[in-house]
Amino acid sequence: MDDERFLECLDADYQRLRAVVADALTAPVPSCPAWTGADLAAHVAEVYLHKAETMRLGNWPSPWPPTFDDPLVALAENYRGLVGEFVARDAGDHSLTWYGPDQTVGFWLRRMAQETVIHRLDAELAAGVQHDPIPTDLAEDGIDEVLVRFLAFGSTEYPEDFGEQLPECDGRTVRVDTGAAGWQVRLGPTAIMVERGQSDQEAGVFGEADAVLRWLWRRADDDAVRLDGDRWVLDKLRAMMAIATQ
């Protein structure tokens, strides 16, 4: 996906999120049990402001976090600020990020597009409305991001965050497959490795890219995808994803 496409997806999902959450401010968010719709709107507003300030300052903003009187107003204002920072910069410009291999504005552009589509799903779940399909290119990019940058990188850089779950892994492999793209996820006891392509595996997660992305982010149940093979390793992947994406 190119920069223009990320911005296009970011805007579409922001507009959908804001419209849906406006009618669900007091509703619980099933995928984020401690939150209401208002909490969701405030969280996304805070994320947008944090990333805009990180790019503007060249450092993590401090003091943090802010407080908002009206989450919907803050959401709109901070979305405009975030997009303003993106359009003022090239994707290849330097920016501090939490992902060591990519210290660029482009990292945040991709991350905010993916952040927004997941929280758009949360808003739809809170409102009890059918979710808008996730475009295939955005969903496949999101699968790659969450497997490589959240799961694999997270398990390597912050293994302590995975507690006893990581040492229990024994090297078995799960294939994540959308038909057009596939990833091999090896659950090792010291790190999780992710590669594109095919190899031998003990289990698989198969489905449309939209469904697979939602399953990996725990925004869909098992019946949204086809699970095949060793149930233990599938459950282990599910548990590891819950930690990686919390």
Question: Language-model features: where?
Answer:
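Non-cleavable N-terminal signal-anchor transmembrane helices
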Residues: 1-27
